[in-house]
């Protein structure tokens, strides 16, 4: 019994020891520095950005009353969401005649390009920041000794900064178009039955765009985070060291110049 218990204890300790060794090797102080702290914020806000946009869903609608009779009121409810291919979303328009009861209609517009680009960029930002944090915390010596890693990190950071600006602006414009296409007034304007005398149309459910608006805000927050992080990543590159070295050399040359001139003047005075 004692041998089996000891074997079980050693088996339980071995995974814990491996986890402890892994945690001990991490350089947690990197998270207190701007380079690591901003990476954590980028990781979080990337989740907020693609999560709020990719999970959005809303409803729009209208009311159609045939022959001005309350008993013939038809309620139209149209659900839509990411990726906002509205032209594929169907709804039934009631017809106020005896020949047919309804007609299949579609919403107008395809706004999937800016929405999918926004979500895709958020997912790539999530994975890159997670990989960068692993390198910062676990392989910090490799990051500081090998100058290629800071250069690659700087180039990628600049690229993500540009892409976040484009994605946030494009999705903001796309969201404005989505709002215009999903208004109840746009729905009634597209239905021919609402333009005749046989029916009276009114606005129905108005879509709530709060989550979509927040996604645009998260997009611009990501842009500012990546733009601000460019400086801190640049300080890790050899380009920043070269610039400081040149400035120090210029200061030394300027400091030596007047001293040499004063020494020459003193020598001339002594000869006289």
Swiss-Prot record:
Any one GO BP annotation for this protein? T-tubule organization
Q: Where in the cell is it found?
A: Membrane
The positions flagged as glycosylation sites are: 213
Q: Which domain of life is it from?
A: Eukaryota
Task: Fetch the InterPro entries from UniProt.
Answer: Marvel (IPR008253), Synaptophysin/porin (IPR001285)
Q: What topology in the membrane does the UniProt record assign? A: Multi-pass membrane protein
Where is the stretch described as Disordered?
240-272
State which residue ranges cross the membrane.
Answer: 34-54, 117-137, 151-171, 214-234
Spell out the family assignment given in the record's similarity comment.
Belongs to the synaptophysin/synaptobrevin family.
Designated name of the protein: Synaptophysin-like protein 2
Which stretches face the Cytoplasmic side? 1-33, 138-150, 235-272
* Boundaries of every MARVEL domain copy: 30-238
Q: Name one GO cellular component term.
A: synaptic vesicle membrane
Keywords associated with the record: Glycoprotein, Membrane, Transmembrane, Transmembrane helix
Q: Which residues lie on this side of the membrane: Vesicular?
A: 55-116, 172-213
Organism lineage reads as: Eukaryota, Metazoa, Chordata, Craniata, Vertebrata
This chain's function reads: Involved in communication between the T-tubular and junctional sarcoplasmic reticulum (SR) membranes.
Q: What start and end residues bound the annotated signal peptide? A: none
């Amino acid at each position: 019994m004692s041998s089996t218990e000891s074997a079980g204890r050693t088996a339980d300790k071995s995974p814990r020891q491996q986890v402890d060794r892994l945690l001990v090797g991490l350089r947690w102080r990197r998270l207190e520095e701007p380079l690591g702290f901003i990476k954590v914020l980028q990781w979080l806000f990337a989740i907020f950005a693609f999560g709020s946009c990719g999970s959005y869903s809303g409803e729009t609608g209208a009311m159609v009353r045939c022959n001005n009779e309350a008993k013939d009121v038809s309620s139209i409810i149209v659900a839509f969401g990411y990726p906002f291919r509205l032209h594929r979303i169907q709804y039934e328009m009631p017809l106020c005649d005896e020949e047919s009861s309804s007609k299949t209609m579609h919403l107008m517009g395809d706004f999937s390009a800016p929405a999918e680009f926004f979500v895709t960029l958020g997912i790539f930002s999530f994975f890159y920041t997670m990989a960068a944090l692993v390198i910062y915390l676990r392989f910090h010596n490799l990051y500081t000794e090998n100058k290629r890693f800071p250069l690659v990190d700087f180039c990628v950071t600049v690229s993500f900064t540009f892409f976040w600006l484009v994605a946030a602006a494009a999705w903001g414009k796309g969201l404005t178009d989505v709002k215009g296409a999903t208004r109840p007034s746009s729905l009634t304007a597209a239905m021919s039955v609402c333009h005749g005398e046989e029916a009276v149309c009114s606005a129905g459910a108005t879509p709530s765009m709060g989550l979509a608006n927040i996604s645009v805000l998260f997009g611009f927050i990501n842009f500012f985070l990546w733009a601000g992080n460019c400086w801190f990543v640049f300080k890790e590159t050899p380009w920043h060291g070269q610039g400081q070295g040149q400035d120090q050399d210029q200061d030394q040359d300027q400091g030596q110049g007047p001293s040499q001139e004063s020494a020459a003047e003193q020598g001339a005075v002594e000869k006289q």
